């Protein structure tokens, strides 16, 4: 009876696969529309269905004859499914007609604005949920109630020195012709106002204020007018507040557009629930709590159009505009000086803060062998305006991945590990949706998450750009060799990527501008961020529309298809490879480059020697691991013992990144825990790695050389210990390093 049962199951599987293939073929014809239930398809009895029935009978007959044979093995490429099933090839084959499907999804998602926490956001959420369900995937939703920020009343005018009105200045966005969008504003900018002289501060960087000091110009009590390009806008506002400015106006470069954005400080997530999720009944800090007050800028700010900024700047007197500022202005102005005055700026702003409901949406594909290991793909769907680039180019790509995986599931494939597709909300306010979910599930994610693959602005121009933690570099390079370049016939993405940048260039993720931040900086999960095109002039403006994408960004939507293919193949490798495709020798090489760069900045070489010893050990551990994994792969892995050994190997790979976390976080910034790639406290820091060192340097800049050396040395020791922890985890053993070896390298205070 057991043999007969197996035979019947094999026959049923064969019939199910045949039905799924017929459904997939017809799905291509309708650009991805899923068919109805198999019973309804059989009721219509087209020729293909007759073939299915015949196939079922034949399979049943053969199975009864060969009862002694075992059922079909798992697919050769690693995922569960029919024998000889290649998930990567199948995924790529589903690109036929995908550009039309992606375009249709993007058009629907961008039909109107969908700012988080507003009624208009429901439409985009419904579209994503419907897409996940149409793919046949299990879905979940999770709601949070964070503090959100919206614009109230605002006004801007130019006054003569005697405070009589010279001109009302517009705070509207010229490109928002129908006034369908939320007016331009800075989220979390406090209410306030000023009647004061203006000073042009160029990009609003520290070096710009030093230039003004040399010219004898101060912004104390005045309105600082800046041009976008000086780093994070919140950092620009904070820098002006530190110089005692009364308010800040920031002009962008988009022709007719005004760039909205958040100015919240101190990292991502809901400011009232730092470290825990903003669920409906959660504890919330008071607004007068020190941890909350330092999250908000001290002075009001507002984005303005180039035309409005020009009207202010051209009235300025004072010292002449520095020559190197003239090329960076980027505005149609005839400027005589940097200010102050002689005219006055009358600026008022009223913020509307309130608790708002946001919703994260998930689709889950459970793994057959390691269901408790998660490969996570994420994109946010909320937008400041229409969001054709930011973020819904990525949303439409995520929906296409869901469609393809759904078809593959119906063909009998199942991933080895669980795949989770995530649609985040309220990213534009400071990565709130993703951060709250990570905080709520931190322990589970730290013990089970394999990697997080992020796509935000999937397409904003030509050429692939990527950032990742270093152990994923080689995986990304391998995958790009499998994907056709969308712009150059006969070339792969790898070919053009390599040529465009003069060699493969993968940046590190020491920034907090998208949803990888909580996964890497707080949870220590390997991350990657992908996008096509480097600069988009309509960023966060009314120009971020489907019309722009169709006319300029990706007219044929083939760059979208390329991103889908790269993103999806990365997920399949991480979900299906027997041994996780991580390379910690590459990680060690990158850390060595960081150590060398740090060495060029510091005089004391003993500190660098301390780092070098740990990095060398990590490299050795990575090589030892590769040899051990190769030996296991050459053996029979069908028995339970070998499967357990492989599981233990993968766990060491999975947990090594967590070793770079400092349990209590960076000094004074406890939410950020990653000692290699958290962002530095100073937004203008020249170090994009070793954030504790960067913080120690900036905080001790006014101290004695002895004190600065002590502060930096302490952070170097932390980093060295973390790297050593990672090496020990890769080896799967307790550390046996003699602490005296480190003590001998200490520097006398």
Swiss-Prot record:
Q: What is the reaction catalyzed?
A: Release of an unsubstituted, C-terminal glutamyl residue, typically from Ac-Asp-Glu or folylpoly-gamma-glutamates
Compartment(s): Cell membrane
The highest taxon in the source lineage is: Eukaryota
**Tissues of expression:** Expressed in developing embryos, roots, leaf blade, vegetative shoot apex, inflorescence apex and flowers.
List the GO molecular function terms.
carboxypeptidase activity; metal ion binding; metallocarboxypeptidase activity
* Segments on the Cytoplasmic side according to the record's topology features: 1-46
Question: Which residues are recorded as binding Zn(2+) 2?
Answer: 390, 428, 540
According to its record, how does it sit in the membrane?
Single-pass type II membrane protein
Q: Which Pfam families match?
A: Peptidase_M28, TFR_dimer
Catalytic machinery residues: 427 (nucleophile)
Which cofactors are required for activity?
Zn(2+)
Give a short account of what the protein does: Involved in the regular timing (plastochron) of lateral organs formation. May regulate the rate of leaf initiation and the duration of vegetative phase. Seems to be redundant to the function of PLASTOCHRON1 and PLASTOCHRON2, but to act in an independent pathway. May be required for the synthesis of small signaling molecules that have a role in regulating meristem function. Involved in plant hormone homeostasis.
> Per its record, how is this protein called by name?
Probable glutamate carboxypeptidase PLA3
Species of origin reads: Oryza sativa subsp. japonica
